[in-house]
């Protein structure tokens, strides 16, 4: 049975995974989370700590036998028993599946939505709305899976349940008000069942579900930012007095989103939004206002209002149209997994939204599907090479530039933007679509 010390900071949801697992397995885990024994941001940067845990990340676990391991999922696995890990190869694979799903699909939108409400990340309206839709998709996926199941894998709690519950915890506490979560009764039932297990309660205490969706508080965010030392100024002109204030505003925009004591390094990376050079700054101004088209598209009828507006105002010199197809349709199996490919790409392209719009569609059924889309980009070239952050997915697609004046472009834009039409070039029925805006 594992025994050792867990280094973390207080109320770290990532550490909860290992602590709940230990409650089930009987592993003896001591927690060091506060001075003088452990000071996050200091202790974890000392040479002694880094010799044991080179990444300097928490949570980190040191066994009484000297064994050291970091990364919360690895620690939770180590302190678990066979029942939690999955007692058969199939069950173990499904546990890993849900643990991976929590990290790849739940953490990004949950962080984007929740962090601003806690004052540790600046609010971006479009990003938040996108995150809400992604959370809604995730809860729906879980709801369908749990319709005939008590737990995610098998008939007992496993690491799958522990991990996904902990990943959803702040969503349920901060933003999933009754009107939002009521559409997912099976997910809610499962979540409540888990958090009311004695082993969960021993770590989480009584979890109070959100009654009213928390909102971004600009004042709280400003107060949470690290205070910078500024040189003292002698009294001078009005411009000299105003300059430090302007500089402080810029520092707030570019600053890391929270003090080190509030987040681990992974969360700091998710929340940080450094001020960067605009990759499109070299392009001349355009008469086409993409945001206005997006408003038309979101709020008006696509065929009768949004598309006529698009073609009337589209600047073919300042913008370009592209058709894309996924290169490896033979690898597409379950349609929900194929949709995850699209959603994951959109998430990684989040900072491209101001200069792009797309409708990407999944056609076909399980084990016989394809993905293709129509994109609008600022400039005359593909935007992806302009930033390393945008280059993860695009090579998995073929790209063909469209002539805005051609009949083909008119047809593709109409069909893909409206999700209606024959789609004769595809040869498969429309399944579902995703909009990048």
Curated annotation (Swiss-Prot):
Biased amino acid composition, Basic and acidic residues: 221-254
Name the SMART domains for this protein.
EF1G
**Cross-link Glycyl lysine isopeptide (Lys-Gly) (interchain with G-Cter in SUMO1) mapped to chain:** 253
* Sequence segments annotated as region (Disordered): 221-268
Residue ranges of every copy of the EF-1-gamma C-terminal domain listed in the record:
276-437
Q: Where in the chain is the Glycyl lysine isopeptide (Lys-Gly) (interchain with G-Cter in SUMO2) cross-link?
A: 285
Every GST C-terminal domain range:
88-216
What Gene3D superfamilies does the record point to?
1.20.1050.10, Glutaredoxin (3.40.30.10), Translation elongation factor EF1B, gamma chain, conserved domain (3.30.70.1010)
Q: Name one GO molecular function term.
A: translation elongation factor activity
Stretches assigned to the GST N-terminal domain: 2-87
Q: Which domain of life is it from?
A: Eukaryota
Stored InterPro entries: EF-GSTs, EF1B_G_C, EF1B_G_C_sf, Glutathione-S-Trfase_C-like, Glutathione-S-Trfase_C_sf, Glutathione_S-Trfase, Glutathione_S-Trfase_N, GST_C
Some GO term, biological process aspect, for this entry: which one?
translational elongation
UniProt modified residues of type N-acetylalanine: 2
Q: Which GO terms describe its cellular component?
A: cytoplasm; nucleus
Record note on quaternary structure: EF-1 is composed of four subunits: alpha, beta, delta, and gamma.
Record-given protein name? Elongation factor 1-gamma
The taxonomic lineage of its organism, from the top, reads: Eukaryota, Metazoa, Chordata, Craniata, Vertebrata
Gene that specifies this protein = EEF1G
